[in-house]
């Protein structure tokens, strides 16, 4: 069946749904009914932009319609256009990956250059989800956890919460039930636990990240490479309910495995160890080993009761921090020894320098005193040679 043509009214309905949280909670039929009364009150000038956009959309659809030659093959120009779009998508993905790597390297190198690498703070995050849409990358979040980490202190703080999205994607109830029963075992909506206000939850997460990383900075979080798409989708799900968003609160999600690789190299550099044999394949393999699956007390109460510790978001968020501690343990000790030796050498150098300065000052004082005494002696000798004395009147 041929696709329906766009019209100005439906363009208005779609825009209203995108811009209003109330509209995003409505079905299409409910939104059409609600917008109908608004559309009736609009004059020709107000409707003009929407009618114009509809005409442009219809024209663009006609241009995109594939033309076939006599053999039923796609036109060469259209094939080249499709290949161009694929190349563009690949370039954007490559640029995004390079930007992630450069930013991660800059964070670690800046801390190293300021001699504060062991106090540099990183935030690790994890989500659990109820279900995923079949044809898109939309995930319905069920639980969120984050932890603040530094090499010196380890896990500094933890933020975790369950999420009640209110509803499951239509037709996905069975998938959500299967996912819950085989992983986290959390109750499904409408009986889900946790925060119901998605905008409030998103602001709470931003406040926690700002507290960890400081005001005026783009929030940067780290998660395992295979979870980056899911974490980004869950953040978008929470953000879309916030009508006050202006794009300034965007959270950047980076690869924690690349962070581990860079940390290993720079810590070895500070410790004076050879880092030529370190490669990302080795650090990735180590990261995927689970050393804490049977550690008690690191999951929430519900997951502990249901013996589902391994799938809880808090545990998923804490595991990277524990893994980094294990992997960098011996290297960190070497780095601390080097830093301690440097501090000892610096203290000894300062003490030696202080003694030299005191010695020079004492020598200068002695020379000044000797010079003064010599001057007085010479002055007295001059008076005696002339047969005069400063106290005798002739």
UniProtKB/Swiss-Prot annotation:
Residues 44-93 are annotated as: Disordered. Keywords: Cytoplasm, Developmental protein, Differentiation, DNA-binding, Meiosis, Nucleus, Oogenesis, Repressor, RNA-mediated gene silencing, Transcription, Transcription regulation. It holds the Pfam family Maelstrom. Its main location: cytoplasm. InterPro entries: HMG_box_dom_sf, Maelstrom, Protein_maelstrom. It is found in: Cytoplasm; Nucleus. GO terms for biological process: germ-line stem cell population maintenance; male meiotic nuclear division; negative regulation of DNA-templated transcription; oogenesis; piRNA processing; regulation of miRNA-mediated gene silencing; regulatory ncRNA-mediated gene silencing; spermatogenesis. Residues 2-69 bind DNA. SUPFAM superfamilies: HMG-box. One of its GO terms (cellular component) is nucleus. Residues 73-93 have a biased composition (Basic and acidic residues). The keyword Repressor applies. The keyword Zinc does not apply. Disulfide bonds: none annotated. GO terms for molecular function: transcription cis-regulatory region binding. It comes from the Eukaryota. Belongs to the maelstrom family. Involved both in the piRNA and miRNA metabolic processes. As a component of the meiotic nuage, plays a central role during oogenesis by repressing transposable elements and preventing their mobilization, which is essential for the germline integrity. Repression of transposable elements is mediated via the piRNA metabolic process, which mediates the repression of transposable elements during meiosis by forming complexes composed of piRNAs and Piwi proteins and governs the repression of transposons. This is Protein maelstrom. It comes from Drosophila sechellia. The gene is mael.
